[in-house]
């Protein structure tokens, strides 16, 4: 992709009210544009990151056996009244009335819709267990949206819902999603920490949050250092993870904590996922039942959320330096930045054009007439994992310079050897 044909409205600075790194860099790098408080347009570069995260999430969800659906953003209020949850969200829920004076709402979550779907379409207990998921926009009218896309009002979420016959089956589904979430976050280049959590207005009596450590996090986490090793292990042991002490500030009690104070680690964390065992909280009041040996029983449910748009902010909080973003290769909008420092030099142009053609969709090619300094500053800000620098002195030696954006390593290499090493 040629930068001259692409749209990346970069900025040198942001306003004084932009306080966290991810908010600053997502604006300066042209990922997003604020439209209203807590509401953003995703620009081309940001949308590529969002789609890359979606693809990683979708791949692991599909591997788990979950099936993708798509539910409506606009929901009838009657379903929420039926579940008994209509008033729980208070002012966070945006309520509307259609032309026939029917009460509707913008979905802050989809437990009621998926429960209604299953109660009217599930024909046999032989279809159980089943887990359905979607990747869909949500709206919650946050009182104080802040930190850009980390805490906004409209956000992209992966939400999944499991349905089982009994408690033992529901716990198996819960543990499967627990393990799937660890895989997802590790595939994104993150080390998550799972902590026991309150269920809040979602409900249920078993819940875990997944956090990534970051100084800008809103939660304070208390944990046994062993949890980091368990989360990074190739062999994911769910029971050991569950039994290793971790807690957010609202669940941590120093008086009852089983870990000696000098063994407890304390860090700030950003919540990036949340899983719940719901039991029959929704199925019972909404009569979502299944028949087994002529006996009608409420479905046992679980729900599982990942904030996909929030993950963009969390990843920037973890992967950045004082020059800009340092994207992990797995989700970077492009794998390579190609920078021709001398856009009027025929030999430099020839080498750059050849690399652009060879790398195709994996490269953002800065073919502008801007000065070398501006180009290098911009490519550091945008944060692609590999920078290919085309300069006159190196081209004369039939070499190009390659820089690793993350660890700052750089080396000279011929185009031929580079393509052998890096081209898919």
From Swiss-Prot:
Annotated InterPro entries: aa-tRNA-synt_IIb, aa-tRNA-synth_II, aa-tRNA-synth_II/BPL/LPL, Anticodon-bd, Anticodon-bd_dom_sf, Pro-tRNA-ligase_IIa, Pro-tRNA-synth_IIa_bac-type, Pro-tRNA_synthetase
Annotated GO MF terms: ATP binding; proline-tRNA ligase activity
SUPFAM superfamilies: Class II aaRS ABD-related, Class II aaRS and biotin synthetases
GO CC entries: cytosol
Catalytic activity: tRNA(Pro) + L-proline + ATP = L-prolyl-tRNA(Pro) + AMP + diphosphate
Assembly mode: Homodimer.
Listed HAMAP family: Pro_tRNA_synth_type2
Family: Belongs to the class-II aminoacyl-tRNA synthetase family. ProS type 2 subfamily.
NCBIfam families linked: PRK12325.1, proS_fam_II
Task of the protein: Catalyzes the attachment of proline to tRNA(Pro) in a two-step reaction: proline is first activated by ATP to form Pro-AMP and then transferred to the acceptor end of tRNA(Pro).
Protein known as: Proline--tRNA ligase
Classification lineage: Bacteria, Pseudomonadati, Pseudomonadota, Alphaproteobacteria, Rickettsiales
């Amino acid at each position: 992709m040629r930068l001259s044909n692409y749209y990346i409205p970069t900025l040198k600075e942001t306003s004084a009210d932009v306080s966290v790194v991810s908010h600053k860099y997502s604006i300066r790098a042209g990922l997003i544009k604020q439209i209203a408080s807590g509401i953003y347009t995703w620009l081309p570069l940001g949308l590529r990151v969002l789609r890359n995260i979606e693809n990683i999430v979708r791949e692991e969800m599909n591997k788990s056996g979950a099936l993708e659906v798509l539910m409506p953003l606009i929901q009838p209020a009657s379903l929420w009244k039926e579940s008994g949850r209509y008033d729980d969200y208070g002012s966070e829920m945006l309520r509307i009335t259609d032309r026939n004076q029917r009460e509707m709402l913008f979905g802050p979550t989809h437990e009621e819709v998926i429960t209604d779907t299953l109660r009217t379409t599930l024909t046999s207990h032989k279809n159980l267990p089943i887990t359905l998921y979607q990747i869909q926009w949500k709206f919650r009218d946050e009182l104080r949206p802040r930190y850009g896309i980390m805490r906004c009002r409209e956000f992209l979420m992966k939400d999944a819902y499991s349905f089982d016959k009994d408690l033992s089956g529901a716990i198996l589904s819960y543990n499967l999603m627990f393990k799937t979430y660890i895989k997802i976050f590790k595939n994104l280049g993150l080390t998550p920490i799972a902590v026991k959590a309150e269920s809040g207005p979602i409900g249920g009596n078993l819940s875990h949050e997944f956090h990534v450590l970051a100084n800008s996090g809103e939660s304070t986490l208390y944990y046994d250092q062993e949890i980091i090793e368990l989360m990074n292990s190739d062999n994911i042991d769910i029971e050991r993870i569950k039994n290793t002490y971790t807690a957010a500030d609202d669940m941590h009690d120093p008086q009852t904590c089983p870990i000696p104070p000098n063994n407890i680690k304390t860090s700030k964390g950003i919540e990036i996922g949340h899983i719940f065992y719901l039991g029959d909280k929704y199925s019972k009041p909404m009569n979502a039942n299944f028949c087994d040996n002529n006996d009608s029983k409420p479905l046992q449910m679980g729900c599982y959320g990942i904030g996909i748009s929030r993950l963009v902010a969390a990843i920037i909080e973890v992967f950045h330096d004082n020059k800009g973003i340092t994207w992990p290769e797995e989700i970077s909008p492009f794998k390579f930045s190609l920078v021709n420092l001398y856009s009027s030099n025929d030999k430099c142009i020839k080498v750059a054009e050849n690399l652009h053609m060879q790398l195709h969709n994996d490269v953002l090619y800065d073919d502008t007439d801007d000065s070398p300094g501006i180009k290098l500053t911009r490519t550091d800000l945008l944060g692609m994992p590999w920078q290919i620098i085309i300069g006159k002195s190196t081209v004369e030696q039939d070499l190009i310079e390659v820089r690793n954006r993350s660890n700052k390593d750089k080396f000279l290499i011929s185009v031929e050897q580079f393509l052998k090493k890096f081209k898919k």
